[in-house]
């Protein structure tokens, strides 16, 4: 059996619980809550049209991958960027997409009606 609590102890417990709830409400209202993730996720303010873009200092110039990226991201980025016809644009994503693929626009193949026809090959008949 549990020990009976006095009304003073119960009131103290209730007060602590209410303080925790109030603190969490304030964090949620302010937009600064850590939902079990290591860094707090704060979305950047939307950028207005016509304003110059800013580059995140976490991205290395010319490399295209964040310096704080995980080894998994680096191991996926390096072989992919060396074996594709396109290139990749680095982005600062809160959703795990550290780069966007950009593929070159290829000219369509000419239709068979417009291609010159080769003379028929000579076949030897028996």
UniProtKB/Swiss-Prot annotation:
Please tell me one Gene Ontology term that the record gives under cellular component: SOSS complex
Concerning InterPro entries, the annotation shows: SOSSC
One matching Pfam family? SOSSC
One biological-process term from Gene Ontology? DNA repair
Q: Where is this region: Disordered?
A: 106-126
List compositional bias (Pro residues) regions by residue number: 107-119
Among PANTHER family, the record links this protein to: SOSS COMPLEX SUBUNIT C (PTHR31526:SF2)
Q: Which family does it belong to?
A: Belongs to the SOSS-C family.
| Protein name (Swiss-Prot/TrEMBL) | SOSS complex subunit C homolog
Organism, by scientific name, is: Drosophila sechellia (Fruit fly)
């Amino acid at each position: 059996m549990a020990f009976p609590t006095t009304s003073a102890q119960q009131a103290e417990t209730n007060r602590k619980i209410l303080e925790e709830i109030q603190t969490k409400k304030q964090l949620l209202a302010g937009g600064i809550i850590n939902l079990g993730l290591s860094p707090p996720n704060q979305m950047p303010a939307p950028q207005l049209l016509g304003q110059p873009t800013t580059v995140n200092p976490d991205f290395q110039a010319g490399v295209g991958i964040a310096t704080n990226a995980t080894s998994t991201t680096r191991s996926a980025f390096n072989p992919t960027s060396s074996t594709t016809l396109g290139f990749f644009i680095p982005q600062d994503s809160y959703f795990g997409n550290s780069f966007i693929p950009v593929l070159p626009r290829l000219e369509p193949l000419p239709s068979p009606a417009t291609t010159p026809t080769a003379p028929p090959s000579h076949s030897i008949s028996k």
